[in-house]
């Protein structure tokens, strides 16, 4: 297999400083296509040239050299247009030797959603409200009385889902393994003093929100959130992989995560500590353990294939229906995806973001999910995993990657991919 000379890795210290994969000169040799599931793009209202432009943008993203594996699924009008993969599950990470045994990724390769898990966890909560089990406007302390300490008695589930609960992190905790201990995490959050009260400020809650939500599910329904997910969503939807964590059998097929881009930058480490409570390197060490996938981390460890993530969002587009079953009511989805407020500066991430109760929202003239995507909703995971639906374009999309670029030249390719999808899938005439 040839290697593109333009992306060949430098040796020695430079290779340790800039992490990139070896990109094959012939990327068709590392491409997987589930042709049995894909339709003719014309059947989904996409011209062949437009479809090819999308795929070329996915290939360009892989060619940046920052992603050992890319899995991509796009549905339009309910039909699968792309269900494909590029790269390797293992054997071609930046620090792997050139002759390391290589395992190709496939369209059905599972990968971790990281923070994109939050949107799915949010729908578990909205489903409970739909069935009268809780009220999202109730204070969290209504369900977890000990959470009321330090003035948090009026902080609601609504505030938590929209990243306005004032507990974006756990002060003084530097060991990322605390997320593996639900009871300890819950105790620390109940004892925590909020940074602000009554939802006055938006600060992205990277991990903390999921701990509280999981405890509410357990106390109200009597089930842990993994069992609730399986009972209410996974089994009725016929999902085989999408779940909190992963079994040993699923984990054996998963992508191996790798840090890519510039390494050793103190600014990146400082940002990660502020958002995640640990550096990206420390997070990756945790993610590389079996304990991480045995645990239930509602804000960050759901595992899925690209097709199943796309299927979940297609269910939302279809008014809550999947496989002939009503999983959610249409009005529940409408409430879940309704904006909480306009784009505001997020005090954790440091950029303007717009949220609903559980989803990141698109924008005008350009947003997280492409151009003119004001009504799109979804979530990103560690910046590069992107899952979303755009009702005006009738698309449900999942882009899963195994590389975690820190400072790298990947953002332009990612933006161009989003723009290509927006261009190839125009908004309906009623919304244009």
Label the predicted regions.
Residues 14-51, 357:
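Short, compositionally biased leader-like segments
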Residues 44-111:
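Short, conserved catalytic-motif segment at the N-terminal edge
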Residues 52, 58-59, 78, 109-138, ...:
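Active-site SXXK
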Residues 61-63, 347-351, 375-380:
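Short Gly/Pro-enriched turn/cap motifs at secondary-structure boundaries
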Residues 81, 106-108, 120, 126-145, ...:
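Short, well-structured active-site flanking segments
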Residues 81-82, 387-388, 394-403:
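Short, well-ordered beta-strand elements
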Residues 150-371:
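Short, surface-exposed loop or secondary-structure junction motifs
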Residues 318-321, 328, 332, 337-345, ...:
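Short, gly/Ser/Thr-rich active-site loops of penicillin-recognizing serine hydrolases
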């Amino acid at each position: 297999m040839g290697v593109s000379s333009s992306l060949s890795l430098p040796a020695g210290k430079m290779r340790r400083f800039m992490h990139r994969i070896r990109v094959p000169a012939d990327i068709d040799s590392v491409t997987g296509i589930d042709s049995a599931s894909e339709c003719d793009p014309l059947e989904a209202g996409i011209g062949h040239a437009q479809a090819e432009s999308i795929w070329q943008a996915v290939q360009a993203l892989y060619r940046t050299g920052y992603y050992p594996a890319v899995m991509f699924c796009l549905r339009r009008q309910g039909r699968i247009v792309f269900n494909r993969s590029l790269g390797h599950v293992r054997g071609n990470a930046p620090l792997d030797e050139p002759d390391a045994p290589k395992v190709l990724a496939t369209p059905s390769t599972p990968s971790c959603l990281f923070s994109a898990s939050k949107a799915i966890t949010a729908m578990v909560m909205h489903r409970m409200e739909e069935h009268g089990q809780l009220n999202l406007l109730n204070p969290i302390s209504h369900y977890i009385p000990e959470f009321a300490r330090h003035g948090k008695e009026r902080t609601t589930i609504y505030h938590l889902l929209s990243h306005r609960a004032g507990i974006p992190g756990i002060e003084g905790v530097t060991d990322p393994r605390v997320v593996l201990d639900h009871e300890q995490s819950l105790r620390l959050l109940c004892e925590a003093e909020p940074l602000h009260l009554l939802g006055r400020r938006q600060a992205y809650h990277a991990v903390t929100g999921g701990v509280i939500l999981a405890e509410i599910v357990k106390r109200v329904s009597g089930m842990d959130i993994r069992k609730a997910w399986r009972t209410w969503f996974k089994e009725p939807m016929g999902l085989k992989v999408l779940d909190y964590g992963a079994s040993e059998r699923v984990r054996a097929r998963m992508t191996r995560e790798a840090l890519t881009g510039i390494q050793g930058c103190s600014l990146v480490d400082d940002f990660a500590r502020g958002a995640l409570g640990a550096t990206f390197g420390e997070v990756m060490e945790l993610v590389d353990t079996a304990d991480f996938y045995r645990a239930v981390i509602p804000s960050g460890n759901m595992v899925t294939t690209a097709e199943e993530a796309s299927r979940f969002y297609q269910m939302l587009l279809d008014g809550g229906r999947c496989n002939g079953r009503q999983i959610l009511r249409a009005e529940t989805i409408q409430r879940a995806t309704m904006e909480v407020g306009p784009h505001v500066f997020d005090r954790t991430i440091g950029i303007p973001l717009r949220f609903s109760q559980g989803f990141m929202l698109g924008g005008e003239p350009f947003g997280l999910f492409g151009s003119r995507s004001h009504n799109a909703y979804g979530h990103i995971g560690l910046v590069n995993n992107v899952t979303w639906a755009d009702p005006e374009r009738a698309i449900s999309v999942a882009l899963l990657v195994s590389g975690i670029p820190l400072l790298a030249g990947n953002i332009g390719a990612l933006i161009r991919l989003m723009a290509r999808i927006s261009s190839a899938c125009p908004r309906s005439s009623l919304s244009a």
